[in-house]
C-alpha cells in the first residue's frame, strides 16, 4: 500500500512511501509523524491516497493512539464493544475479537489491572472491530517497559502477520526498526530513505539518517581531494590524521569539513586467511572494551581521540586474541563509508 499525502494544516508535510507488512516510520519528535497518522485517519484536512476525500467514519483504518486511549471505567470487552454497533451481538463480537488477540480470559478486567502489553492488545482488538484495511499505530512502544518491549512488540507484529493486515507505526525509537518488515525514515518533514531493515540499517543514506538509526560510528573529516575518477580522499584528523579512501563524491571540495559514518558490521578484522586480506582503509586502534553478545563481540577501539565500534565474529576475536589494551589494525573498506 502506498501512502501519498500532502498536509498544510499544523505542519507542512509531503510524503510518499510504501507500507508493506509491519512498517515503521522513523523520525525525531516534531517531524509530523503523528500529524500524518491523523491525516490518514481523516482527523486532519489533507490531500492524498489512500482514503482521500472520505469522512473519518468511512475510512477503513484502525487507529491505536499513543497510550492506547482505553476507557479506565470500562471493562476490556466493553472497550472493544465501544467500536461495535449496538445490539445483542455486541458482547459476543467483542469477546471474539479479544479471543483473536488471545485476551478473552481478561475480558472482565479494567484497563488499570492489565499490563502494558495487554492494554495494547485490547486497543488492537478495538481497532480490528472496524474491519480495517490499514492499521495505524502512534509510538506503540512508548507505554511499554524496557524489560518486556521486545517481546510485546514481536507478538504484536506476529499478530499483524496472522491477520494479513498492513500496519504503519510511527516512532522515534530506532530499536523498533530492526523488528519491522519495512522502514521509512523521515527527516526535514520528508522521506529521505526507505527499504527493508537490513538495507536501511546496514547502509544509511546519510549521517543524518545514521543518527536517527542510533549509529555510534559518526565522525568528522576534512576533504583532501579526488585521487582519480573513482576515489575521494578524506583526512580523519582526530584519528592521528590518517587518510581514508571512499567512492568518489564529486560534490565534495578540498578543505571541506564533512561528516561520515560506517556501520560496526562494515568494519573488518583481518581475515583468518591472511592471503585473502587486502585492506582498502587500514586503521589501527587499541581495544578499550569488548562485550560478548554470543555470535559476535561488540568491540570499542580507541583511534586517536575517537572511539570506533566494531561488530566482530567470536572466531575472529579469539583468533586475534583481542583483549583490553591490545592493538589491532582493522579495515574500513570503502563501500561501507557513507559521507
Protein language model regions, located:
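Conserved ABC ATPase signature
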Residues: 110-114, 118
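Conserved ABC ATPase "signature" C-loop
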Residues: 189-190
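ABC ATPase "signature
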Residues: 194-195, 203
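Catalytic Walker B motif of ABC-type/P-loop ATPase nucleotide-binding domains
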Residues: 135-139
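A short, proline-enriched helix->beta-strand linker immediately N-terminal to the Walker B motif
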Residues: 129-133
